[in-house]
Amino acid sequence: MPKVHVRKGDTVMVITGKDAGKKGKVVTVEPAKNRVIVEGVNIVKRHRKATPQMPQGGIVEKEAPIHSSNVMLFCNKCNKATRIQKKVLDNGNKERICKHCGETLS
């Protein structure tokens, strides 16, 4: 299974494709497919038939997954998309650090 560099809840910036430059929160991570779903990015329209849960039916807009290589973590301190550096603390915990400013990313 490929390793994905982002986690659910991270703020990311899309770096390529039709939504390049947009920021959003990661809603879902699919490590088996190496894809992520980002809030407000890669919106697609799906035609839905009426069901008991949705009696109206019609055209529904939703976020579609994008490849994880097309997003970068976004650092709020330096306000840039950034790569990360991993550091092991004395107690054994790992933390992710912004390559630009050295700030710890949650």
From Swiss-Prot:
Keyword RNA-binding appears in the UniProt entry: yes
Keywords, in A-Z order: Ribonucleoprotein, Ribosomal protein, RNA-binding, rRNA-binding
GO-annotated biological processes: translation
Listed transmembrane segments: none
GO molecular function: rRNA binding; structural constituent of ribosome
Domain of life assignment: Bacteria
A Gene Ontology cellular-component term: ribosome
Function according to Swiss-Prot or TrEMBL: One of two assembly initiator proteins, it binds directly to the 5'-end of the 23S rRNA, where it nucleates assembly of the 50S subunit.
Subunit structure: Part of the 50S ribosomal subunit.
HAMAP family: Ribosomal_uL24_B
Record-stated family: Belongs to the universal ribosomal protein uL24 family.
Protein name: Large ribosomal subunit protein uL24
Organism (species): Desulforamulus reducens (strain ATCC BAA-1160 / DSM 100696 / MI-1) (Desulfotomaculum reducens)
Gene this chain is encoded by: rplX
